């Protein structure tokens, strides 16, 4: 449709990537974590309209986000106008899932007071002036989630090696008997590691950080193996996990 002239900072869409490589779209491949700060500094220009997906919006201007937060708090605060996409594909049970917090920018930034994955320091919604909300568009459009390759003997072995290594360090006293928070990546190897940790009953239930909560994490939460997962977004490719 040639509707995009410029985009930052991240994409996984093959058609978009082709358009960028053909010079049809200007693209800034900055780190995802830097985008909100770049916007606040004004490097991306003025924010006229913010389009925000939500599972609920209230008359007093509370916007409850869906599967991700990202730069939504920043653009909502800076935008002249806000359009809310109220997506019925996301349950209202997602209300309370988010921890909305904007840090100060350098050189005035202070420490972010999070000391364990289950800490909360913000609000479960974005608070905006309701007068800025110029439209609410109702949709029912599930997320397009990419599934990962199924586990195979190689990934299973990698996962088991990591679990054995951590269990051995716990037995040696290097890791305390209560275990420690883990940070997991994304993909079939990360899923294999989490699966092996979940099966090893010598490792107690643990909290974890991850960039994206996937089906494997949801399964471990249901089994009582993961006590809490802290992430930037959810990428769930079955309706059972989403529920």
Language model segments and positions:
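Conserved alpha/beta enzyme-core scaffold
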Residues: 1-243
């Amino acid at each position: 449709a040639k509707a995009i002239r410029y985009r930052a900072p991240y994409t996984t869409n093959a058609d978009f990537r082709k358009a960028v490589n053909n010079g049809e779209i200007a693209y800034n491949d900055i780190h995802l974590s830097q985008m909100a700060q770049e916007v606040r500094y004004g490097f991306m220009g003025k924010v006229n309209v913010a389009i925000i997906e939500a599972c609920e919006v209230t008359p007093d201007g509370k916007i409850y986000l869906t599967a991700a937060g990202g730069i939504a708090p920043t653009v909502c605060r800076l935008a002249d106008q806000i359009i809310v996409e109220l997506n019925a594909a996301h349950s209202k049970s997602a209300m309370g899932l988010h921890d909305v917090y904007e840090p100060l920018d350098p050189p005035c930034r202070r420490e972010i007071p999070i000391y364990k994955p289950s800490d909360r320091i913000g609000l479960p919604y974005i608070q905006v002036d309701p007068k800025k909300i110029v439209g609410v568009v109702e949709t029912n459009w599930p997320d397009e989630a990419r599934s990962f390759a199924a586990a195979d003997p190689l990934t299973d072995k990698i996962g088991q090696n990591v679990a054995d290594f951590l269990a051995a360090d716990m037995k040696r006293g290097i890791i305390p008997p209560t275990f420690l928070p883990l940070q997991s990546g994304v993909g079939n190897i990360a899923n294999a590691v989490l699966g092996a940790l979940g099966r090893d009953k010598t490792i107690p239930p643990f909290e974890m950080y991850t960039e994206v909560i996937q089906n494997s994490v949801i399964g471990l939460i249901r089994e009582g193996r993961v006590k809490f997962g802290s992430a930037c977004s959810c990428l769930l490719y079955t309706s059972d996990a989403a529920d």
